[in-house]
């Protein structure tokens, strides 16, 4: 497993990028502004996005990621997050006011993005890699 740090700051400017890590080529942990430094080819390879929480410095580039490559893919980008974080994304970002709801585009059977609820302590296994959400106070 190769982990590439795309950003680890709470702000932007100069060399600062907000939190995001690329695992191998296909898994993103958080979607901070460092995602914007990836090439179009690298963006297209991302199949899964794990969100640690809903703060803007961790989710800012998710709408742009899906908007940029969603129509170029044959399968949806899967967004993994707790029920609380998913509800915040649906209510405040992918709500047709701030950004389109890509879980319904082009239709609900074939979306560009799919939400998957993470439960604390329950692992998600992807290609032999295990990801487990743990509680944090932030």
Per-segment meaning from a language model:
Residues 29-31, 59, 133:
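Short capping micro-motif at the N-terminus of alpha-helices
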Residues 1-42:
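Conserved beta-strand hairpin/beta-sheet module of binuclear metal-dependent hydrolase folds
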Residues 34-84:
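Active-site metal-binding motif and surrounding structural segment of the metallo-beta-lactamase
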Residues 18-20, 76, 119-123:
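Short, acidic/polar N-cap/turn motifs at the starts of alpha helices
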